[in-house]
Amino acid sequence: MGSSLNDRSVVITRSLSQNESFRRLLEARGAHVVEVPLIAIAEPEDEGRERDEVLQRFDEFDWIVVTSPNGADCVAPFLVASNAAGDAIRFPSLAAVGEATARSLGVTVAMTANPARADVLAEQFPQGTGSVLVVQGNLADDELGETLTAKGWTVTRVVAYRTVQLRPTREMMLPAMAADVLMLASGSAATAWFDSFGTTTPPFVVAMGPSTAKVALALGLEVTDVAPEQTLESMIQTAERVIATL
């Protein structure tokens, strides 16, 4: 049986560097993909100096917690190089929000939140008195760090990357407005959509996870359904379910 997305037009709003895998998955279902990159991933304001300084001494921490594949891409080179050289005094335990983040780290991960949400990781993280490095983007809130602190840990938070907003061209906007489905993979993408399009959306809007849906709803966007897991496959399956009910 074919996908209900076959011959449907689907808008994806992730950064260009992240859109390719999403586009391939949708095209495999027969969807017509409309790419409207509304965000981009950039270096932090200090060009990553603080991040790199902290990661160069990562073996001082008992745990490293990474909340996204973007953060994992910043951490992985330090971990892999040290692991290969065998020069780390000790290797911290690693915790990741979601399987995609865990895979991006490139080394063994002790704890993976599933579904891929920071609040799930915070809940399952143990009580302790050691040190934890939390690696996040500039738009992440402090809830994860605060929860770990309440559990007894000494938390250091470092901004690994910065999410910046892009403005779509008119040539991008027209096919997006005529599409069947809008995929919002983050709260920042929802905000960027609102800033460019207002509350006007395609007929169906799928949000990745409750945090993205919360931002979209607060902006006045009508969210048709919420993917239960913060993965591309979960978003696609949710969109298929929505379309199949027509």
Residue ranges and their predicted role:
Residues 1-246:
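Conserved beta-alpha
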